[in-house]
């Protein structure tokens, strides 16, 4: 299997998405099975417990959409928390902003970071050696629960789909704790699953954030290797959430360093909520 190209599939609710390639690494960590695959089209890719997580070719569709709507619109962004994010892509995008002075990246599975540093160097880029990034191998829920009030300007939840060790990252109690440790005008940004392949979880996340925060907005775009291809990211705040109010000079500089995100892309993506989701949120 490690020498010959083969089709490697993710199975989800009677469907599957396969990539042709060679397995470069297969190992079990304390939490999950980890595969690194050299795919024919998407380059090196990370698979966790049989689910595609990211690839060198398509990762920016995910990471740029998670990070830039929040960081381009908030004035104070010096202290950032990333829950998960072991591939380094979210940290890389955050570090494009000179105002960011400290990032705490809390990843429960150290092996994900190790294999990403070795095999997915294009994704983490220079983030791993940036002095502003502090890596903590810890449980994200416990980290948030033990953090002082008003500690972070932005929190990014960059986690995998709900599982035995990540379910608590999708609960009301966790979102309330995140709210507590945000600064007054802070923003919570989270991947909020697919409105197609994970509709029930998606609805749960949006309803929870609508209930816990005064303001929330959801954007939709595509991540090619994820189930159904369509994905979402939700942003929430209690004081201010004007995601189109940006520093245009700064945005132009960021846009020039992005492959997917720009302000026009973002503005359109926030208007793409499927009507079935609208109706279920209002029911």
Curated annotation (Swiss-Prot):
Signal peptide bounds: none
Pathway note: Amine and polyamine biosynthesis; spermidine biosynthesis; spermidine from putrescine: step 1/1
Catalytic reaction(s) noted: S-adenosyl 3-(methylsulfanyl)propylamine + putrescine = S-methyl-5'-thioadenosine + spermidine + H(+)
Domain named PABS: residues: 5-238
Summary of subunit composition and partner proteins: Homodimer or homotetramer.
HAMAP family registered for this protein in UniProt: Spermidine_synth (MF_00198)
Record's protein name: Polyamine aminopropyltransferase
Taxonomic source organism: Prochlorococcus marinus subsp. pastoris (strain CCMP1986 / NIES-2087 / MED4)
């Amino acid at each position: 299997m490690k020498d010959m190209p083969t089709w490697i599939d993710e199975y989800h609710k009677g469907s599957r998405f396969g990539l042709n390639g060679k397995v470069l690494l297969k190992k079990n960590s304390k939490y999950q099975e980890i595969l690194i695959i050299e795919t024919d089209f998407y380059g090196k890719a990370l698979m966790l417990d049989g689910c595609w997580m990211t690839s060198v070719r398509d990762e920016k569709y995910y990471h740029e959409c998670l990070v830039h709507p929040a960081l381009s619109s908030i004035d104070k962004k010096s202290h950032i928390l990333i829950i998960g994010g072991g591939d380094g892509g979210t940290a890389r995008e955050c570090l494009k902003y000179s105002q960011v002075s400290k990032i705490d990246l809390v990843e429960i599975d150290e092996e994900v970071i190790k294999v990403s540093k070795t095999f997915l160097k294009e994704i983490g880029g220079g983030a791993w050696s940036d002095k502003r990034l502090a890596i903590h191998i810890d449980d994200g829920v416990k980290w948030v629960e033990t953090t002082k009030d008003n500690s972070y300007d932005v929190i990014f939840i960059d986690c995998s789909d709900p599982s035995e060790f990540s379910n608590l990252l999708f609960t009301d109690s966790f979102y309330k704790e995140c709210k507590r440790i945000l600064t007054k005008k802070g923003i919570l940004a989270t991947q909020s699953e697919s409105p197609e392949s994970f509709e029930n979880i998606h609805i749960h996340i949006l309803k929870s954030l609508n209930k816990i925060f005064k303001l929330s907005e959801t954007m939709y775009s595509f991540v090619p290797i994820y189930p159904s291809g369509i994905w979402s990211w939700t942003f929430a705040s209690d004081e201010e959430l004007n995601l189109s109010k940006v520093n245009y000079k700064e945005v132009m500089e960021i846009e020039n360093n992005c492959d997917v995100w720009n302000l026009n892309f973002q503005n359109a993506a926030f208007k793409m909520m499927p009507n079935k989701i609208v109706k279920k949120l209002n029911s």
